């Protein structure tokens, strides 16, 4: 076993090499939280804060090899462990050694080149939460090693959840690390327009030079891609040209690739070559964090209870949350209010609440039941019937939760609508789903997807 002093030197060298070879965002997310627990029999035991980061670390063997030869004078292998996967025995064994921590240096991003990027979107001002944590991790990994880690990166989710923010953040970070990088951000609609204009003006060579020689292509909202064969063929060829030369491709959509009915199977399959990851609606804590950050620049005072009230009123997406805060600010300034209380916020958001209520005015228990049954591929009779296997009981709880949440129906009335069940059963179902919504991303995603149907 290596001495503690040698271990410290070894880990210090690993982190130093990492800082020299990867971007700050990737270092902060993947390297900084990692801990060297011990070096035993020429194997470094490294503890990660999440098993999701193992794939990234498996590609960092050069760091370990180089540091091993420099400090120990021999080849050092490494074993990866994760806090969320460890057994008690492994944890006790690994904790016999103290981790080594290294401080980080902070690098300021530079201004982007003319490439369609918006410099205000970066990783630093992207608020992380349960609904976007792993997508953020993937974006950071892509920005650190474009064309290598996840290519293409396909991000999907509802409107206003931060997909475009992450696209620009990837581009801005890559441009910071490599100011000569050729980067283009473009919506699918503008890609189509560029192609149509090029064909009309007989400028296809210029079009191909623009798109096929990029280091990074950021294509937003691919669900709006044209049905025209010429456009799809051109993008297919552009995708292949970029992929073959190792350029990074990032795509966003409001749905998974397999649901993009306007695109050919050959394109859809390519979209799935890398990593497909989603963003769901922000939970309460994330909404509060967003409001705290945004309110700091308003020059008005927002007590925490006021922000909590706003966060409780808007649970759909970040864009609507920011819009609600802007509306509250406007009403406060118009009335000469410098300390924004709940009454002011309530007054400002009243019209928004009325609009939401209007959109749900035609919603019924039966419509919710039908939508949930359809989403989980079960029959209506099973949803409200006596069967209790998990594949039926869970959708039933989801449906009860949504009826209570969206319609405010009484517990006994909900029980009656679900086959005459007791109100305590409904109460239990509502609590179960409410608890899962706090930390289960799959449940959050299901609820968000079903809500969007309404």
Curated annotation (Swiss-Prot):
The keyword Nuclease does not apply. Residues 116-332 are annotated as: Domain III, AAA+ region. SMART domains: AAA, Bac_DnaA_C. Pfam families: Bac_DnaA, Bac_DnaA_C. Residues 333-454 are annotated as: Domain IV, binds dsDNA. CDD domains: AAA, Bac_DnaA_C. ATP binds at residues 160, 162-164. The keyword Cytoplasm applies. It is found in: Cytoplasm. Residues 1-77 are annotated as: Domain I, interacts with DnaA modulators. Residues 77-115 are annotated as: Domain II. One of its GO terms (biological process) is DNA replication initiation. Keywords: ATP-binding, Cytoplasm, DNA replication, DNA-binding, Lipid-binding, Nucleotide-binding. Its main location: cytoplasm. GO terms for cellular component: cytoplasm; plasma membrane. GO terms for molecular function: ATP binding; ATP hydrolysis activity; DNA replication origin binding; lipid binding. HAMAP family: DnaA_bact. Plays an essential role in the initiation and regulation of chromosomal replication. ATP-DnaA binds to the origin of replication (oriC) to initiate formation of the DNA replication initiation complex once per cell cycle. Binds the DnaA box (a 9 base pair repeat at the origin) and separates the double-stranded (ds)DNA. Forms a right-handed helical filament on oriC DNA; dsDNA binds to the exterior of the filament while single-stranded (ss)DNA is stabiized in the filament's interior. Domain I is involved in oligomerization and binding regulators, domain II is flexibile and of varying length in different bacteria, domain III forms the AAA+ region, while domain IV binds dsDNA. PANTHER family: CHROMOSOMAL REPLICATION INITIATOR PROTEIN DNAA (PTHR30050:SF2). Belongs to the DnaA family. Oligomerizes as a right-handed, spiral filament on DNA at oriC. This is Chromosomal replication initiator protein DnaA. It comes from Lactococcus lactis subsp. cremoris (strain MG1363). The gene is dnaA.
């Amino acid at each position: 076993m290596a001495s503690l002093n040698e271990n410290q030197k070894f880990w210090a060298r690993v982190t130093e090499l990492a800082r020299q070879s990867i971007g700050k965002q990737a270092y902060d997310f993947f390297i900084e939280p990692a801990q060297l627990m011990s070096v035993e029999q020429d194997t470094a035991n490294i503890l990660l804060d999440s098993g999701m980061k193992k794939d990234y670390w498996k590609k960092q063997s050069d760091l370990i090899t180089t540091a091993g030869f420099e400090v120990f004078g021999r080849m050092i292998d490494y074993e990866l462990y994760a806090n969320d996967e460890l057994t008690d025995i492994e944890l006790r064994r690994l904790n016999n050694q103290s981790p080594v921590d290294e401080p980080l240096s902070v690098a300021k991003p530079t201004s982007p080149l003319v490439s369609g990027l918006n410099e205000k979107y970066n990783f630093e001002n992207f608020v992380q939460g349960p609904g976007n944590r792993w997508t953020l991790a993937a974006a950071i990994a892509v920005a650190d090693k474009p064309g290598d880690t996840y290519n293409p990166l396909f991000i999907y989710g509802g409107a206003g959840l931060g997909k475009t923010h992450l696209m620009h953040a990837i581009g801005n970070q890559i441009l910071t690390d490599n100011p000569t990088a050729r980067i283009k951000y473009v919506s699918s609609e503008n890609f189509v327009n560029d192609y149509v204009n090029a064909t009309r003006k007989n400028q296809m060579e210029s079009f191909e030079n623009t798109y096929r020689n990029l280091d990074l292509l950021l294509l937003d909202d691919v669900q709006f891609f044209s049905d025209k064969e010429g456009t799809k063929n051109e993008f297919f060829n552009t995708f292949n040209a970029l992929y073959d030369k190792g350029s990074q491709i990032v795509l966003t959509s409001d749905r998974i690739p397999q649901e993009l009915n306007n695109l050919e199977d050959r394109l859809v399959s390519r979209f799935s070559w890398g990593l497909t990851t989603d963003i769901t609606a922000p939970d309460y804590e994330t909404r509060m964090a967003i409001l705290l950050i945004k309110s700091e620049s308003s020059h008005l005072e927002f007590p925490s209870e006021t922000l909590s009230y706003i966060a409780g009123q808007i649970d759909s997406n970040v864009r609507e949350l920011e819009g609600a805060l802007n509306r509250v600010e406007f009403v406060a300034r118009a009335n000469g209010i410098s300390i924004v209380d709940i009454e002011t916020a309530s007054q400002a958001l009243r019209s928004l609440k009325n609009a939401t209520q209007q959109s749900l005015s035609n919603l019924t228990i039966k419509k919710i039941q039908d939508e949930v049954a359809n989403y989980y591929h079960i029959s209506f009779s099973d949803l409200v019937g006596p069967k209790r296997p998990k594949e039926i009981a869970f959708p039933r709880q989801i449906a009860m939760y949504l009826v209570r949440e969206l319609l405010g129906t009484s517990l006994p009335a909900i029980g009656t609508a679900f086959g005459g069940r007791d109100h305590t059963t409904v109460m239990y179902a509502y609590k179960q789903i409410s608890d899962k919504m706090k930390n289960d991303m799959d449940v959050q995603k299901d609820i968000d997807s079903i809500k969007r149907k309404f």
